[in-house]
Amino acid sequence: IIAMENHPVRWTTPLGLPVVQPYRKLGRHLIKTSLQILTLQRETDKVMVKRQRTAFPPNFVHSLDGSHMMMTAIACKESGLSFAGVHDSYWTHASDVDQMNKILREKFVELYDAPILENLLESFQQSFPDLQFPPLPERGDFDLREVLESPYFFN
């Protein structure tokens, strides 16, 4: 919907980091010299509608994963734990794994207890007041707090 209006899809993560999908159509510019012809490719002002649409779901989920990682890293630091991570792999000293597992579950519940989709829709509506967005799906009945007791939630 947004890309069809020639705007890149953008949102703000739960931690306040702005994200803008950079996918724009490329244009060619020929430069002729006495020795050769060079072709330069540059982004145009037109967005790639299909790429904006297909990239948004995984990019949005990755931004939530990154928010969860940062929340976990900050909480580990505040608890005196060493923390390292790449994508969805989190590391600490072997003696601190149980404490880190507890922290990452707590931060997951904290993150997803927030009205993430509601906030996303509201930001889209504020940024594009003339566009009509579909309603959000209803929330399911899963008790997010079950994650706190799940031994295999994140392992």
Swiss-Prot record:
Gene3D superfamilies: 3.30.70.370. It catalyses: RNA(n) + a ribonucleoside 5'-triphosphate = RNA(n+1) + diphosphate. It is an enzyme of class 2 (transferase). The active site is at 88. One of its GO terms (biological process) is DNA-templated transcription. Coiled coil: none annotated. It comes from the Eukaryota. GO terms for molecular function: DNA binding; DNA-directed RNA polymerase activity. Keywords: DNA-directed RNA polymerase, Nucleotidyltransferase, Transcription, Transferase. Its EC number is 2.7.7.6. One of its GO terms (cellular component) is plastid. Belongs to the phage and mitochondrial RNA polymerase family. DNA-dependent RNA polymerase catalyzes the transcription of DNA into RNA using the four ribonucleoside triphosphates as substrates. This is DNA-directed RNA polymerase 1A. It comes from Nicotiana tabacum. The lineage of its organism: Eukaryota, Viridiplantae, Streptophyta, Embryophyta, Tracheophyta. The gene is RPOT1-SYL.
